[in-house]
Amino acid sequence: KTLWFTLLLIGLYTSFLNASEITRWVITSPDSICWRVNGVHNDHIEMSGLKVSTVLRYGVNEAGEWVIDRNMVLPTFRTIPNDTHGSLQHHFNGDWAHLCLVNGQPLVGEKVETVSLNGIMTVKSVYATRGISLTRTLFPSTSQPAFCEKYELENTTDHPQTVQLPSTTLSYYTDEAKGVEGSYTLTATLSSPVKDGTYLLKAGEKAWFQVIYAGYKKHDQELALDVNNELLARRRFLSQIQGNLVLETPSDVINTMFSFAKIRGSESIFDTKGGYMQSPGGEAYYAAVWANDQAEYINPFFPYLGYQAGNRSAMDSFGLFMRYMNDEYKPLPSSIIAEGIDCFGVAGDRGDVAMVGYGAARYALASGNCNEAEKLWPLIEWCLEYCHRQLNADGVVKS
């Protein structure tokens, strides 16, 4: 009895710990979660656009201040060796709010109040000793090799305050010998609508500055991005994804989880020389497609979502696999990498051909598009014939 009672207490204590972990984030809508800060915590999330993916490692320290590291991944900036993992990565570490001046004094004494996620990260903080509230908005560009941040300061006092916002550009240059296209340039550009960045804010008035993290190849023109236009484009993308194929169950957790999964699956499509390529990400897998992840799993999902960029990525990936069909019925590669110019396979077939054939057939049925089906039919037939040739004596496909 004592043993069972002890085990029961351990189980209840574990459940309590798990419950505490779960309730750090609160669902505020079917598409949004919020962390109301009440202690130290660190977390991470990846967000992507057609030309960029960024992993944010963020949190709140013991002083209540915001801490962040941004690992920007540029899938089309290929590095040497140009393999599965050959996407340029660069860390931009630290926050920029401390560069602001309020009445000539540094902006210090931050207390982060909330962190919200809905495809965009929003961080709200107060600086009680300075009479300032700050809202940070973080998100990827939908179309450019850039990640965007907006810092908006509000005067929360009943008297005017002078706010000075930073303006500068930091540049980093990669080793020419390690880039497929030579040296790449990475920049962090801070700017505000007013050239000198100085504002006299009355009670309740706001001022903002933007930070654009961008990548450039040789001879690329400098991007002139406006954070508000980029934010509008991101919101349009999210509205489309969140508004289609809405899951409604008795569980708010499952509904919200599905909403976030739709965003992640759709945003991680990269515009490459090999076409639109949906990739797993995770600081490892970009500008490449796999027989399982893409052909079998997510490609048949996109017609249900009604996302045209997703359908395009599906057709592009099937087209890449079609290039490897052969009269000898040798296996297809497991993955097609480096923007489609190379491939990776295991010794023999791990079921990749069956995956591709299944996914192509499911996609054709789901899309209901005769033109697409006609393009996919040779691939489907080839995969079926391959599998037929792999039947063993018991009628099971060998792989």
Where are each of the predicted segments found?
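The feature captures the catalytic groove of carbohydrate-active enzymes
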Residues: 200-227, 283-287, 333-355, 385-399
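Terminal accessory carbohydrate-recognition/targeting modules of carbohydrate-active enzymes
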Residues: 17-256, 306-307
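Short amphipathic alpha-helical segments with coiled-coil-like heptad repeat character
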Residues: 1, 158-162, 269-270
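Bacterial Sec-dependent N-terminal signal peptides
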Residues: 1-21
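A generic secondary-structure signal for well-formed alpha-helical elements
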Residues: 155-157, 213-219, 305-309, 321, ...
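Substrate-binding groove/exosite segments of carbohydrate-active enzymes
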Residues: 239-374
